[in-house]
Amino acid sequence: MRNVYLGYFLEAFVVAGLTEETCKFLFLRTTWRSPAFDFQFDAIVYAVMVALGFAAFENVKYVYSYGFATGLVRAVTAVPGHAIFGVFMGYFYGYAKLSDYWGREDDCRAYLALSVVVPVLMHGCYDFLAFAQESDGRFTLLFYAYLIALYVFGILRVNRSARADRRVSRETVFDYFRRMQYPVPPQYRDRNDDFWR
């Protein structure tokens, strides 16, 4: 029985958690130099979008392989789980961007590492409990308690991060439009620079 749980552990933390969260992080990393990434909370938005894109792709694969019922179960468990992992990835990614903005390279690297490590651990715990509850019913209650805790902490993290949002770029979107010589959208032409700061 111990070997079964070791297999679940390796599958959950290494195969699923590490691989999937690293892939999501690599996609997220493409936003680092985007002029649209000018506020800390943007990191959470980008990370959740990447996570939901991954979850949609994964769900299509599961529905195709195991049927529609599996897709329905995953829609209320795995898909929100990926979104919550994305929230925490984005939270630390946003702090990495803020640290970079302030010129704190060591903090930036540490937060970038945390933006992968924390979601890997969260994802690994989720998958381990999901695998274990399939073979031992005693894990079912623990799995759903963990799922509810993820939802609650994820929502709290989003709310707190939204309230504490800070600028992480010196260039505003308006500055970017001017630099790239893009036309300013008509509804914003009469706004002064203070509107964008």
Regions found by a protein language model. Name each.
Residues 1-197:
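Hydrophobic alpha-helical segments at protein termini of multi-pass membrane proteins
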